[in-house]
């Protein structure tokens, strides 16, 4: 009996030790890559948060990208207010939460930036703001960005990351497709350069409007780029589609983008393109 009690006590002590050790291990040390499914130690993602196995770029906040890409940045005033025209339930609360998470008023950060003294208008979408969806305020900020660039004679660089039009605003969000496209057209008519960089994900109404209307379209490795999502396509076609159909590499092969650029090279490539087209988009 004493031997049994001793063994039981040892077992309890071992269980308690394991529970305490488990509690001391912080969350988030290991992350699963959404593309290759490999488990990665978080420090191995590095400064640019890139999978060391497949080079997939993890979704990143707009203000973090800003540090990667530019030497200076002057933000545009956040004058565009996000409406709730359909009185969608809990939409204001969802907006406030997204604003707290990202530090942005809406899903895009806009302003005027420089890379090695090359000045340009910059917009960076944030996938952590309601999946980077495009609402009325987003469309207004993008439109104002292009109008400013047209007025000042500046090129535009826009980093797209969006699930598409924001469902909480219904037809008002879809109207932003035409609105932003008109602003892009006016900018192009002045012979000014527009570069877009498509990141994961770039889908829906954003893909069908300003994101793919650029003079030069770049993308990140393994980024999902398309209009409808995989599930919608498969339900419509009643068949499975290739796993890589909407990957940037397939989109490049099919001629819809111009180049895939890794995160560590983006600042250099963008500077080279700005320098090359100092006289305008057609030089």
From Swiss-Prot:
Source species, domain of life: Bacteria
A Gene Ontology BP annotation from the UniProt entry: malonyl-CoA biosynthetic process
Name under which the protein is recorded: Acetyl-coenzyme A carboxylase carboxyl transferase subunit beta
EC number: 2.1.3.15
Amino acids binding Zn(2+): 33, 36, 51, 54
GO CC, any one term: acetyl-CoA carboxylase complex
Subcellular location per the Swiss-Prot or TrEMBL entry: Cytoplasm
Cofactor: Zn(2+)
The organism's taxonomic lineage, starting at the top: Bacteria, Bacillati, Bacillota, Bacilli, Lactobacillales
One Pfam family this sequence matches: Carboxyl_trans
Organism: Latilactobacillus sakei subsp. sakei (strain 23K) (Lactobacillus sakei subsp. sakei)
């Amino acid at each position: 009996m004493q031997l049994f009690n001793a063994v039981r006590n040892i077992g309890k002590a071992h269980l308690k030790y394991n529970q305490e050790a488990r509690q001391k291990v912080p969350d988030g040390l290991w992350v699963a890559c959404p593309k290759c499914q490999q488990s990665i130690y978080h420090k191995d993602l590095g400064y640019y948060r890139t999978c060391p196995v497949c080079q997939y770029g993890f979704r990143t906040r707009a203000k973090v990208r800003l540090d990667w890409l530019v030497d200076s940045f002057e933000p545009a005033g956040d004058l565009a207010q996000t409406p709730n025209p359909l009185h969608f339930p809990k939409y204001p609360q969802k907006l406030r939460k997204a604003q707290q998470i990202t530090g942005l008023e809406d899903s895009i950060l806009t302003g005027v930036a420089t890379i090695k003294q090359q000045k340009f208008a910059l917009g960076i979408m944030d996938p952590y703001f309601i999946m980077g969806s495009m609402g009325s305020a987003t469309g207004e900020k993008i439109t104002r960005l292009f109008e400013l660039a047209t007025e000042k004679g500046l090129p535009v660089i826009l980093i797209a990351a969006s699930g598409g039009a924001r469902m909480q605003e219904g037809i008002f969000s879809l109207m932003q497709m035409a609105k932003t496209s008109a602003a892009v057209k006016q900018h192009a008519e002045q012979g000014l350069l527009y570069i877009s960089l498509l990141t994961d994900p770039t889908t829906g109404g954003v893909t069908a409007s300003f994101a793919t209307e650029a003079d030069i379209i770049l993308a990140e490795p393994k980024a999902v780029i398309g209009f409808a999502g995989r599930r919608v396509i498969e339900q419509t076609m009643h068949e499975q589609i290739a796993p890589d159909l909407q990957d940037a590499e397939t989109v490049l092969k099919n001629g819809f983008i111009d180049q895939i650029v890794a995160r560590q090279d983006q600042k250099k490539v963008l500077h080279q393109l700005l320098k090359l087209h100092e006289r305008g988009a057609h030089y």
